[in-house]
Amino acid sequence: MTAQDQTDHTRYRRVLLKVSGEALMGRRDYGLDTDTVAAIAQDIADVVAMRVEVCLVIGGGNIFRGISGAAGGMDRAQADYMGMLATVMNALAMQSALEKRGVATRVQSAIPMSAVCEPYIRRRAERHMEKGRVVIFAAGTGNPFFTTDTAAALRAVEMKCDVLLKGTQVDGVYSADPRKVADAERYAELTYHEVLARDLSVMDAAAISIARENDLPIIVFNIHAPGAFASVMRGEGKFTRIVEQR
């Protein structure tokens, strides 16, 4: 199948993938698992080969979570800034893994740190993606009290993405954690209102609200299932879709 054929079989032109920091831990309790990072990078490379424009937001919970630091007595804003720096570390690790697979990648940080990455500039990020480069947005929104889920929704809207994908540890949204509740119900499709009304642990309310106000579909899938990202691009496999109306 040629690259053009692959493009014709995908549903989306430009997408944002949100990956939690915890997803990069693999079976570790802390930090980065290089095999897991490599596997996710390969899945991203496969989607780039389909000529889909890809950007990413990566969390930092595998290294530091601001809200946990605040719970331990640390100033919340200070703790959140530490969490933002953790996302930069994860972004650099993913950039390295992608470039080893021949995927041109740029990291843009909402907190300028010119020695290691570019500052976040919306139009520059768009140009990178138009040229087939992956762009990883680091440091969240650059402001404390906002999660990386909110940053993902914000960047997806700014980049005019067709869909926001959240790669998680399970294959969609459930009524309860399926790893703890055997009979948890899996949803194939939900509305933004249902997610908020049922208090489902998908994304925080701010992220859902941004998506809803801008008619941005959200797809939740298992980031650890090999090839799942590419399958979702073709409308295949198991996932949950969140939209305005079912």
From Swiss-Prot:
KW Amino-acid biosynthesis (keyword) present: no
Binding site for UMP: 60, 80, 141-148
Keyword Membrane: no
Gene3D superfamilies: Acetylglutamate kinase-like
UniProt EC number: 2.7.4.22
Sample GO molecular function, one term: ATP binding
Pfam families: AA_kinase
Functional description taken from the UniProt entry: Catalyzes the reversible phosphorylation of UMP to UDP.
HAMAP family to which the protein is assigned, alphabetical: PyrH_B
Protein name per Swiss-Prot or TrEMBL: Uridylate kinase
Organism: Acidiphilium cryptum (strain JF-5)
UniProt lineage: Bacteria, Pseudomonadati, Pseudomonadota, Alphaproteobacteria, Acetobacterales
